[in-house]
C-alpha cells in the first residue's frame, strides 16, 4: 500500500510516484540517490528526493504542464534529470528522454512528433540546441535548464532556470498540499511511464511506449 502525505498507507504501490512517496514515508532518512560531483559524493535521502520531485512537479504545473503532456528531458545522467521523469509522471505526463549527444536537427523531429511543449535540459549546450530548432518546433513553449552557467545573458522569454521552477513549486506545494496528492491519485497502472524514440537508422525515429 502507498503512503499518503501523512505517511499512512492509502493506495496500491502501482505507480512510480506512489512508490516514491511510500519510500519517503517508511525510509525517509535512508540514501536514495548518490552522485560524485567534483570528486565528492553527494547524497540525497528518500525524503529529500520526494520533496524535490514534488516541488518540480508543482512548478511544472504552475507553468501549465498537465496530464497527457510530454516532457522532453535532455542531458547527462544527473539526479535532477531522473527526478524530472518522476515529476512528469506525478502530473500524468510522459517523460521523453533524448540522447544528449544528438544534434539539434535530430531532436527537432522528436520534439515535433511528440508535440513537446516543455523541455528540461541540462546546460547551455542543450539550451543552444533547443533555441536553434525552436522555430521548427511550434509546440515548444518552455525550455528549463538545470545548470545556469553561461546563461546570464540569455534573454529569450521561453527560458527559465530549473532552480526558479522548483522554488515556485515549493510555494505552490505549501499553499496547496493536496494538489500533488490528488494528481498522483489519478495515476493508473496502464498510464504510459516513458516514451523512448528509436535511433531512426532504418527510417524516421519512432516513439515507443
Specify the residue positions occupied by each region the protein language model found.
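Flexible, non-catalytic linker and terminal segments flanking ANL/adenylate-forming cores
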Residues: 1-14
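AMP-dependent adenylate-forming
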Residues: 19-44, 150-151
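Structural core segment of the AMP-binding/adenylate-forming
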Residues: 21, 58, 62, 90-168, ...
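Conserved pre-ATP/AMP-binding loop-to-beta segment of ANL
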Residues: 28-31, 160-166, 170-197, 204
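Conserved AMP-binding/adenylate-forming core of the ANL superfamily
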Residues: 32-78, 82-86, 103-108, 161-166
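Short coil/turn motifs that cap or connect alpha-helices
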Residues: 45, 66, 94, 204-205
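Conserved S/T- and glycine-rich ATP-binding loop of Class I adenylate-forming
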Residues: 71, 88, 119, 192, ...
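Hydrophobic/aromatic ligand-binding patch that stacks against planar heteroaromatic rings
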Residues: 87, 207
Amino acid at each position: 500500500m502507498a503512503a499518503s502525505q501523512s505517511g499512512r498507507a492509502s493506495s496500491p504501490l502501482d505507480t512510480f510516484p506512489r512508490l516514491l512517496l511510500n519510500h519517503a514515508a517508511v525510509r525517509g532518512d535512508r540514501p536514495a540517490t548518490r552522485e560524485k560531483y567534483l570528486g565528492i559524493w553527494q547524497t540525497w535521502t528518500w525524503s529529500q528526493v520526494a520533496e524535490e520531485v514534488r516541488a518540480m512537479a508543482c512548478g511544472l504545473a504552475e507553468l501549465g504542464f498537465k496530464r497527457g503532456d510530454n516532457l522532453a528531458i535532455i542531458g547527462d545522467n544527473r539526479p535532477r534529470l531522473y527526478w524530472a521523469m518522476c515529476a512528469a509522471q506525478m502530473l500524468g505526463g510522459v517523460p521523453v528522454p533524448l540522447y544528449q549527444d544528438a544534434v539539434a536537427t535530430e531532436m527537432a523531429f522528436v520534439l515535433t512528433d511528440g508535440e513537446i511543449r516543455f523541455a528540461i535540459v541540462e546546460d547551455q549546450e542543450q539550451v543552444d540546441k533547443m533555441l536553434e530548432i525552436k522555430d521548427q518546433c511550434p509546440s515548444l513553449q518552455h525550455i528549463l535548464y538545470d545548470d545556469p552557467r553561461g546563461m546570464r545573458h540569455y534573454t529569450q522569454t521561453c527560458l527559465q532556470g530549473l532552480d526558479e521552477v522548483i522554488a515556485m513549486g515549493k510555494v505552490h506545494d505549501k499553499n496547496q498540499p493536496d494538489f500533488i496528492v490528488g494528481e498522483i491519485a489519478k495515476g493508473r497502472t496502464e498510464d504510459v511511464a516513458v516514451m523512448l524514440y528509436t535511433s531512426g537508422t532504418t527510417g524516421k525515429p519512432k516513439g515507443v511506449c
